[in-house]
């Protein structure tokens, strides 16, 4: 990682974790086994805008559920991977499939399972309230 302006100028794709990145981290279980997550509406527009501007958008999350899947399918992300137990493998597969160099990718995560992915990409970022290890 060098000069931030130079690093960000190369970006062609954004890859995100979900819980703690698009949400406040709170999860409420439903009787059917699914979970309700509280999302910030402005994040949704950012996904749509990035897509319109030609960026690839990928979601890689350990969470799973029908509501989660429907939310990101609605916003037509390039790739959605839920229930993931090996994020770095999925990140590498996404980059290979899309012809991306790691320097062209932003990864946003908030917790320890995201660290390998953050080390892999050119622009690792985290929310202000991320785990201190991140």
Where are these regions (language model features)?
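Non-catalytic pre-domain segments flanking phosphatase-related domains
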Residues: 1-16
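Short, well-ordered beta-strand core segments
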Residues: 14, 57, 80, 124-126
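A positional/architectural concept
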Residues: 22-52, 62
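Substrate-recognition element of Asp-dependent hydrolases with the DxDx(T/V) motif
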Residues: 47-71, 81-82, 118
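Short beta-strand/loop segments at the ligand-binding rim of alpha/beta enzyme cores
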Residues: 53-58, 97-105, 122-124
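Short, acidic/turn-prone active-site loops that include or flank metal/cofactor-
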Residues: 83-88, 129-132
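Conserved Lys-Pro-Asp/Glu-containing loop-to-beta segment of HAD-superfamily phosphomonoesterases
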Residues: 88-115
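Acidic, Mg2+-coordinating phosphoryl-transfer loop and its flanking beta/alpha structural elements
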Residues: 106-134
């Amino acid at each position: 990682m060098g000069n931030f302006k130079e690093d960000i100028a190369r970006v062609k794709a954004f890859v995100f974790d979900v819980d703690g990145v698009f949400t406040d981290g709170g999860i409420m279980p439903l009787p059917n086994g699914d979970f309700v997550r509280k999302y910030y509406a402005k994040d949704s527009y950012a996904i749509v805008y990035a897509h319109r501007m030609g960026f690839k958008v990928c979601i890689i999350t350990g969470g799973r559920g029908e509501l989660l899947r429907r939310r990101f399918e609605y916003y037509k992300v390039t790739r959605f991977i839920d229930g993931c137990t090996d994020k770095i493998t999925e990140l590498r597969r996404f980059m290979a499939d899309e012809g991306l160099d790691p320097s062209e990718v932003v990864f946003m995560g908030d917790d320890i399972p995201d660290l390998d992915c953050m080390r892999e990409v050119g622009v690792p970022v985290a929310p202000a309230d991320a785990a201190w290890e991140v």
